[in-house]
Amino acid sequence: RPDFCELPAETGLCKAYIRSFHYNLAAQQCLQFIYGGCGGNANRFKTIDECRRTCVG
């Protein structure tokens, strides 16, 4: 899996409410979080399937 899958979920600096998914290293699965719309990091996916393909598979 790519190194960015190990980064923590980051909401970012903006105040939007965008349902997103990230890989949670401790839980070893993709989990939902709310993204603010700007900033953050690469451990952010639009769908849980995209997260799983990238970080779990």
From Swiss-Prot:
GO terms for molecular function: serine-type endopeptidase inhibitor activity. PANTHER family: BPTI_KUNITZ INHIBITOR DOMAIN-CONTAINING PROTEIN, KUNITZ-TYPE PROTEASE INHIBITOR-RELATED. Residues 5-55 form the BPTI/Kunitz inhibitor domain. It comes from Hemachatus haemachatus. GO terms for cellular component: extracellular space. It is found in: Secreted. SUPFAM superfamilies: BPTI-like. Serine protease inhibitor. The keyword RNA-binding does not apply. The record marks K15, A16 as: Reactive bond for trypsin. The keyword Disulfide bond applies. Belongs to the venom Kunitz-type family. Keywords: Disulfide bond, Protease inhibitor, Secreted, Serine protease inhibitor. Expressed by the venom gland. This is Kunitz-type serine protease inhibitor 2. PROSITE patterns: BPTI_KUNITZ_1 (PS00280), BPTI_KUNITZ_2 (PS50279). Disulfide bonds join C5-C55, C14-C38, C30-C51.
